[in-house]
């Protein structure tokens, strides 16, 4: 028997064949659907991106942060300040918002990395509250009332509202696809192996030569930068930002944690499932106020009791399906018969 290493699975190949036309249809959505669907799918796209980033932190690097809303707010405020007070072009401000959030994450990481376990989670939340309180006290940021985008800024995107909606939708879709692709490729690399080693046992991974601090530092800062860019795009669509909205733990962290835990933490597929569950519940129960939050809590408890590894974790355990395989499999195959040439 011959041995060969495979990374793809039958399920992943079939999924790629299905996902490609779906992605093409989503890209073409502005030409065959209305603004309502574009706004909904754009929201699904940036929630998926946020969930993948938090899953990378908690599910693979073992950094259970409950303060990622800090970088959503920082990215949003950077966009509004640069376009408003500094009269910067909106696209340039978008490009700066992400690196700005990543830059702020550098000193934050040195503070919170001194903490472990639940203390790390609490520390990230405290830092987020510090940013929210600071924003509510700074007059140039609108203090407690926040900031709004002017019509002149919106015209930089497009003078036509329908074209502007289409551009913002495509930007949301693009950032979601890029984030998912980066996470997938990262986890397939040696850096992904280092992340999972740190998550499973930091002392053991350090003894094997993994630079644990540098690896966690890079992942934390990179996810903060991506989260800041997503936050800027979110509030560019919402047209207004305030400390309560930008640094909301419920909107940008609790919901994301729900998606990841329900779908399956430590899997790329999990955030997809969790996002669909959350959006479906919210849309079906939209007429009942916040009752969907109660139902979300009940579903979360039920899933954690019946399937601690999440919905996709249960699927993997039962059916061994992997749509985004990140590991390697050793496959035994019959030897290839030698070719004989006829004379």
Model-predicted segments: where are they?
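Transmembrane alpha-helices and adjacent helix-loop boundaries
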Residues: 1-343
């Amino acid at each position: 028997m011959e041995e060969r290493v495979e990374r793809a699975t039958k399920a992943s190949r079939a999924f790629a064949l299905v996902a490609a036309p779906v992605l093409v249809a989503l890209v073409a959505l502005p030409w065959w659907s209305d603004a309502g669907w574009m706004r909904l799918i754009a929201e699904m796209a940036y929630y998926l991106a946020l969930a993948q980033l938090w899953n990378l932190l908690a599910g693979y690097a073992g950094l259970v942060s409950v303060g990622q809303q800090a970088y959503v707010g920082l990215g949003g405020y950077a966009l509004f300040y640069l376009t408003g007070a500094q009269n910067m072009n909106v696209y340039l401000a978008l490009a700066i918002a992400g690196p700005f959030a990543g830059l702020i994450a550098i000193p934050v990481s040195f503070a919170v990395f001194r903490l472990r376990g639940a203390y790390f989670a609490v520390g990230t939340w405290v830092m987020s509250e510090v940013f929210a309180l600071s924003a509510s006290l700074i007059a140039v940021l609108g203090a407690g009332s926040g900031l709004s985008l002017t019509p002149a800024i919106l015209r930089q995107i497009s003078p036509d509202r329908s074209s502007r909606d289409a551009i913002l939708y495509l930007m949301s879709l693009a950032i979601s696809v890029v984030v998912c692709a980066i996470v997938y490729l990262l986890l397939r690399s040696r850096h992904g192996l280092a992340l999972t080693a740190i998550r499973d046992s930091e002392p053991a991974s350090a003894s094997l030569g993994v630079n644990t601090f540098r690896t966690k530092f890079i992942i934390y800062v990179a996810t903060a930068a991506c989260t800041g860019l997503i936050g800027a795009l979110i509030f560019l669509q919402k047209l207004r930002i305030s400390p309560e909205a930008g640094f909301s733990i419920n909107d940008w962290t609790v919901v994301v944690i729900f998606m990841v835990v329900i779908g399956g933490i430590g899997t790329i597929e999990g955030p997809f499932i969790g996002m669909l569950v959350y959006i479906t519940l919210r849309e079906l129960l939209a007429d009942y106020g916040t009752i969907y939050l109660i139902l979300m809590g009940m579903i979360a408890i039920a899933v954690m009791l019946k399937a601690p590894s999440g919905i996709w974790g249960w699927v993997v355990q039962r059916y061994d399906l992997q749509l985004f395989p990140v590991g390697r499999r050793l496959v035994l195959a019959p030897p290839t018969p030698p070719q004989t040439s006829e004379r």
